[in-house]
A protein has these predicted regions:
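Acidic, low-complexity terminal tails and accessory targeting/binding regions
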Residues: 2-61, 70, 96, 141-150, ...
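Loop-to-helix element that buttresses phosphate recognition and phosphoryl-transfer chemistry
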Residues: 67-123, 154, 167-186
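Phosphate-handling substructures
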Residues: 80-81, 122-185, 249-252, 264, ...
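Phosphate-coordination/substrate-recognition cap region in phosphate-metabolizing enzymes
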Residues: 4, 21, 33, 91-160
Length: 271
C-alpha cells in the first residue's frame, strides 16, 4: 500500500539507492496521519535531482514567500507580491537549476508565481512564460486577508473541517478544493500533451494547485491535499512518457535543500 492508498501508487514515485525521503507522522486519538515532507532527495549524493527517466520533464515549483505566507495569513487570489525572502528563494532556485536549459515555461497568471518564474529564468529571458488563469490559487473568499485565529473566531467548524475534511468545505464566497483540482488538472493535462521529446518545462504555481496536481498523479483523491508538503520555492520533478500505458512519475518531491534546509517551515493551512 502507498501510505494507505491504492498499491498501484508505487509506480508513480521514484526512490533511488541512498536517497532520502521524510514522512511526518502525527497521532490523534488512536489513528495516525502521514504527510510527505519530501521524496527521493539526492543532493547529498552530489546530484541536485535524479536523472531523467521519461521522454520529457516538468519542474513544478511553488512560488516564493510573501509577507502573508510569513504571517500565516490566508491570501488565496489576492495578488500579494513576493517579499525579499521570497525573491531570495527564487534566486536560490535559479542557482540550483542553473544548468537546466528550459525550453518551455508556464505560470499561474498571478504575479507571485510569475515573478518567481522570471527570476528562475533570468538567464533565459527570451523564453516566453505562458500565464494560465486556471492555475491561480484557490479562492478563499471571505477568508482572504485573515489570520487563522480570526477565521477560527467566526467560522470555527468550517475551519476545523478545512483541516480535517477539506473536500467537504466550500470557502465562504470562494471555492472548494474540488473546483481547484478540476481546473488545475485540466490545465496540467494540456501542458503534458504539449510536451515533445526531451522538453524541459518550468511550471510555477501555488500550494493548493500543486497539491491537487500531485494527488492526481498519485491517483489519490484531492481530499488528501494535507498529505502533500509544498514549501515556498520547493521543487517537484515530474517525468512524462510518450507511452500512454506509462503514467507520469514523481522523480522527486518538495526539494528544499537549496533554500538552506531539508524541512520547510511554511505556515500550515494558510495558502
Amino acid at each position: 500500500m502507498f501510505l494507505g492508498k491504492p498499491k498501484q501508487g508505487f509506480r508513480k514515485i521514484r526512490l533511488e539507492n541512498a536517497s532520502f525521503s521524510i514522512l511526518n507522522i502525527s497521532r490523534k486519538d488512536n489513528s495516525f496521519k502521514t504527510q510527505i515532507e519530501c521524496l527521493n532527495q539526492t543532493s547529498h549524493l552530489n546530484k541536485n535531482f535524479p536523472n531523467q527517466i521519461g521522454d520529457s520533464r516538468i519542474f513544478l515549483i511553488r512560488h516564493g514567500e510573501t509577507n502573508w505566507n510569513k504571517e500565516g495569513r490566508f491570501q488565496g487570489q489576492i495578488d500579494i507580491p513576493l517579499n525579499e525572502n521570497g525573491k531570495d528563494q527564487a534566486r536560490k532556485t535559479f542557482e540550483y537549476l542553473r544548468n537546466i536549459s528550459f525550453n518551455k515555461a508556464f505560470s499561474s497568471s498571478m504575479n507571485r508565481p510569475y515573478e518567481t518564474a522570471q527570476i528562475i529564468l533570468q538567464n533565459n529571458k527570451e523564453l516566453k512564460i505562458e500565464r494560465i488563469d486556471s492555475l491561480v490559487e484557490i479562492s478563499h473568499g471571505l477568508w482572504e486577508g485573515k489570520l487563522e485565529a480570526e477565521i477560527r473566531e467566526q467560522w470555527p467548524v468550517l475551519l476545523k473541517n478545512w483541516h480535517d475534511k477539506p473536500e467537504e468545505v466550500i470557502m465562504p464566497e470562494g471555492e472548494s478544493i474540488k473546483d481547484v483540482s478540476e481546473r488545475s488538472v485540466e490545465a496540467f493535462d494540456k501542458i503534458c500533451l504539449s510536451q515533445k521529446d526531451n522538453d524541459l518545462s518550468l511550471l510555477v504555481a501555488h500550494d493548493a494547485v500543486n497539491k491537487t496536481l500531485i494527488c492526481n498523479i498519485f491517483g489519490i483523491n484531492y481530499s488528501n491535499i494535507w498529505m502533500i508538503k509544498q514549501g515556498n520555492g520547493g521543487i517537484t520533478i515530474i517525468d512524462l512518457f510518450n507511452d500512454p500505458n506509462k503514467p507520469p512519475v514523481i522523480s522527486a518531491l518538495n526539494i528544499t535543500t537549496h533554500l538552506g534546509g531539508i524541512i520547510d517551515s511554511t505556515a500550515s493551512g494558510a495558502l
